[in-house]
UniProtKB/Swiss-Prot annotation:
Molecular-function GO terms, alphabetical: cadmium ion transmembrane transporter activity; manganese ion transmembrane transporter activity; metal ion binding; symporter activity
Upper classification of the organism: Bacteria, Pseudomonadati, Pseudomonadota, Gammaproteobacteria, Enterobacterales
The protein, known as: Divalent metal cation transporter MntH
GO biological process, one term: iron ion transmembrane transport
Gene: mntH
Family statement: Belongs to the NRAMP family.
InterPro entries: NRAMP_fam
Native source organism of the sequence: Pectobacterium carotovorum subsp. carotovorum (strain PC1)
Domain of life: Bacteria
UniProt keywords, alphabetically: Cell inner membrane, Cell membrane, Ion transport, Membrane, Symport, Transmembrane, Transmembrane helix, Transport
Function of the molecule: H(+)-stimulated, divalent metal cation uptake system.
Membrane topology of the entry: Multi-pass membrane protein
Regions annotated as coiled coil: none
Length: 412
């Protein structure tokens, strides 16, 4: 029938459009599986088994909404979050925003860079400094893809995300978690002790990444040849798929740690080195190697994304541009200083997350304000319920990060 052929052709064209527009959310999703997430999820699973899996589920749902709002801002207005702040805030506030955003980007990169270096160290038996040099070389090579446009970089970052997801499918097979207990942990909220509250705050509070909010609105702001409706429709699919994969990885990390460590009497696993060394005798060499490879993949991809985010905030806030290789060189200096000074890398990783917490409200509040502004967003303005849920997320995430900040600073 001619009519059915037209409908089939239209449907096929729509799928091709969606496919061509997918990618930005995969770059953003990398921020949710960085080495900081590895450390928090492993510690939570080792200490409390499957009990805190529900926190990962809810944190991921919140992150989905936040990333969708960020992407929608770029689509609806053709400007990213940093540019909107620049255009609407007083100049002193804009400069203050830029400085804090750069500090946040560097603090985030510190955790990601050192995480990848630890991965190389564990896999190859090299020193942490040699691991850092390998990380620097690898990130420079990945960033060179940016010269060929956004798509090749999206494909590589997306490939690394899928690799980490595949690695954790294998880890789940090795660790064989108890499915009924796993499902119960995902569905039933429980906080058995005050330490569990702190770990839950760590899982949830470290979920929303300020630099990725800035970056996602930039990745979707360029119009191309597609309509806003087509782009937003594709973006919803993009965010749903990418963030679901990131959520699965976080769930798998915690479930693997629960199955491998908690129920074997290793509840005190608190750092990445110990997790790797404990995995080998429990689950075999292959499981430990896969863990190391996934840590390297997550660290490399997230540190590249952090570099791109830093470029976006600089261009957006102060209209200043430097070559990516210069930015990469500058932002990895703190990591080398930490390594050369002999500081505990896991401790530095935790402290970097505290610094990051300062920037969360500063990114979320204007994002919610702009996407709830009908004059700015037109027909793509947030609905009443989306706005209320967004406000609730802001209050919750900021409160948890302040709680984490106070607790961490009191322990120093």
């Amino acid at each position: 029938m001619p009519g059915s052929r037209v409908i089939e052709s239209t449907s096929r064209t729509s799928r091709k459009v969606k496919l061509s527009l997918m990618g930005p959310a995969f770059i953003a999703a990398i921020g949710y599986i960085d080495p900081g997430n590895f450390a928090t999820n492993i510690q939570s699973g080792a200490a409390y088994g499957y009990t805190l899996l529900w926190v990962v589920v809810w944190a991921n749902l919140m992150a989905m909404l936040i990333q969708l709002l960020s992407a929608k801002l770029g689509i609806a207005t053709g400007k990213n979050l940093a540019e909107h702040i620049r255009d609407r805030f007083p100049r002193p506030a804009v400069w203050a925003y830029w400085v804090q955003a750069e500090i946040i980007a560097m603090a985030t990169d510190l955790a990601e860079f050192i995480g990848a270096a630890i991965g190389f160290k564990l896999l190859l038996g090299v020193s942490l400094l040699e691991g850092a040099i390998l990380t620097a070389i690898a990130t420079f090579l990945i960033l060179m893809l940016q010269q060929r446009g956004q798509k090749p970089l999206e494909m590589v970052i997306g490939g690394l995300l899928l690799f980490v997801a595949a690695a954790y499918i294998v880890e789940l097979v090795f660790s064989q978690p108890e499915l009924s207990a796993l499902a119960k942990g995902m569905a039933m909220p429980s906080l058995p002790t005050s330490d569990a509250v702190l770990l839950a705050a760590g899982v949830l509070g470290a979920t929303i990444m300020p630099h990725v909010i800035y970056l996602h609105s930039s990745l979707t702001q360029h119009e191309g040849s597609h309509t806003r409706a087509e782009r937003y429709s594709a973006t919803k699919v993009d965010v749903a798929i990418a963030m679901t994969i990131a959520g699965f990885v976080n769930l798998a990390m915690m479930a693997t740690a629960a199955a491998a460590f908690h129920f074997s009497g290793n509840q005190d696993i608190a750092d990445l080195d110990k997790a790797y060394l404990t995995l080998e005798p429990l689950l075999g060499k292959a499981a430990a190697v896969i863990f190391g490879l996934s840590l390297v993949a997550a660290g490399l991809s997230s540190t590249v994304v952090g570099t791109l985010a830093g470029q976006v905030v600089m261009q957006g806030f102060v209209r200043f541009h430097i070559p990516l290789w210069v930015r990469r060189s500058v932002t990895m200096l703190p990591s080398f200083i930490v390594i050369l000074s002999g500081m505990d890398p896991t401790r530095v990783l935790v402290l970097s997350q505290v610094v990051l917490s300062f920037g969360i409200a500063l990114a979320l509040v204007p994002l919610l304000s702009f996407t709830g502004n009908r004059e700015l967003m037109g027909t793509m303005v947030n609905g009443k319920w989306v706005q209320r849920i967004g406000q609730l997320i802001v209050v919750l995430v900021v409160s948890l990060n302040m709680y984490l900040l106070i607790d961490t600073m009191s322990g120093i």
